[in-house]
Amino acid sequence: MAVPKRRTSKKVKNQRRTHKKLHVPGMVECSNCGELTKPHRVCKSCGHYDGKEVVNG
């Protein structure tokens, strides 16, 4: 069975995990109501996308 020969230091362990962080999604302002939404998606508050109403009510 494989067993580590030396203890993994905190530095090496943390360097290996640098890509496991959470990323904050980019947000854009809705052109109709000004609400923050994810880009290329329909606004949840007003239902507009690309300057047109897509969802009613």
Swiss-Prot record:
Keywords: Ribonucleoprotein, Ribosomal protein. The keyword Ribonucleoprotein applies. Residues 1-21 are annotated as: Disordered. Disulfide bonds: none annotated. Pfam families: Ribosomal_L32p (PF01783). GO terms for cellular component: large ribosomal subunit. The keyword Phosphoprotein does not apply. GO terms for biological process: translation. GO terms for molecular function: structural constituent of ribosome. Belongs to the bacterial ribosomal protein bL32 family. HAMAP family: Ribosomal_bL32. This is Large ribosomal subunit protein bL32. It comes from Oceanobacillus iheyensis (strain DSM 14371 / CIP 107618 / JCM 11309 / KCTC 3954 / HTE831). The lineage of its organism: Bacteria, Bacillati, Bacillota, Bacilli, Bacillales. The gene is rpmF.
